[in-house]
């Protein structure tokens, strides 16, 4: 992945509704209708947030007739976690 990909993923998760949606998807695939039931937002607002999460690559969408099911793209997430995990943290000794 490119540096810009990590930026887009982190920006997507930096918004509270999208982070809440991501947290809901941690337990597995969900229909957009179920996400909508749990959040106090409109359908167009949900569509916007899901588009952002899908466009950055963190979430995959699969259409099944009239419903769309969303799941976390584990490969993309692992890439982001690997990027963040390569960070060396230093603590001051007191």
Predicted features along the sequence, with ranges:
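Amphipathic alpha-helical dimerization/coiled-coil segments
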Residues: 1-6, 23-27, 74-94
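Short capping segments at the starts of secondary-structure elements
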Residues: 16-17, 27-31
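Pre-recognition alpha-helix immediately N-terminal to the DNA-recognition helix
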Residues: 19-21
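Base-recognition residues in the alpha-helical recognition helix of bacterial helix-turn-helix
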Residues: 23, 47-49, 66
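Alpha-helical residues within the helix-turn-helix
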Residues: 37, 54-55
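Helix-turn-helix DNA-binding motif, specifically the short coil turn and the N-cap/start of the second
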Residues: 42-45
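Beta-hairpin "wing" of winged helix-turn-helix
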Residues: 55-64, 71
């Amino acid at each position: 992945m490119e540096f810009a990909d990590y930026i887009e993923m982190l920006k997507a998760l930096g918004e509270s509704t999208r982070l809440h949606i991501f947290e809901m998807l941690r337990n597995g695939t969900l229909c957009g209708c179920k996400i909508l039931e749990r959040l106090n937002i409109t359908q167009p607002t949900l569509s916007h947030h899901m588009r952002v999460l899908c466009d950055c690559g963190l979430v995959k969408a699969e259409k099944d007739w009239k419903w769309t099911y969303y799941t976390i793209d584990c490969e993309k997430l692992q890439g982001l976690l690997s990027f963040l995990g390569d960070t060396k943290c230093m603590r001051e000794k007191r």
